[in-house]
């Protein structure tokens, strides 16, 4: 990644690389990057992602330029071409979670939802485009959420300000999830994650308990396949 940054700096006059020197905090990193940006649209993108189609960014921008849209998320795939992200549903796991995890890239999903561009309550920030106007209106990302749920929180803030959050299935990337940072498998990481759960619930408990407006209450919250609630 860092070698690529140097290659970008050397080969493109219109590219400027800034370096964040602090410890890992996804919200702080993106707030730092946004403060250095000059454009009207920001692309938040993990370093463990890989484009499938070179037109992905242009595709997302097409939706993000609409006046009523504040955020656009992509369809993200594991290395085996199964779905890692196709939108986020409030209430999964008691907080929020990705829709259609593990389904085939070519699966249509519940009523074609994997393949249809649509509004969601949230999308992942592993690949998220957002308007500068929206980002600044809500004060950027919440820095108390260093790793988990900062994207969900940001999407809910933007929606509260009146913008839509759109999932775009035609913007596809591979996401080698947690390849760069590892999993939440140590006592310290588990404690931090549980703390971030509490922060999310302290901010959005009412919305989560009321149910996701883009999810049928007759469907289960126990897994991501949109099957009937038991």
Regions from the language model: what does each represent?
Residues 20, 45-47:
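Catalytic metal- and UDP-sugar-binding loop of GT-A-like glycosyltransferases, i.e.
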Residues 70, 80-81, 92-119, 165, ...:
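C-terminal, non-catalytic tails of nucleotide-sugar-dependent glycosyltransferases
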Residues 25-29, 35, 91-133, 137:
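A recurrent flexible, glycine/aromatic-enriched loop bordering the glycosyltransferase active site
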Residues 42:
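Short aromatic/hydrophobic "clamp" motif used to bind/position activated sugar donors
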Residues 21-29, 34-37, 51-52, 147-148:
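A short, glycine-/small-residue-rich helix N-cap motif at loop->alpha-helix starts
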Residues 1-23:
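Acidic donor-binding segment of Leloir-type glycosyltransferases
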Residues 49-93:
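Conserved donor NDP-sugar-binding/catalytic core segment of glycosyltransferases
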Residues 56-60, 114-139, 143-174:
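A short, conserved alpha-helix in the catalytic core of glycosyltransferases
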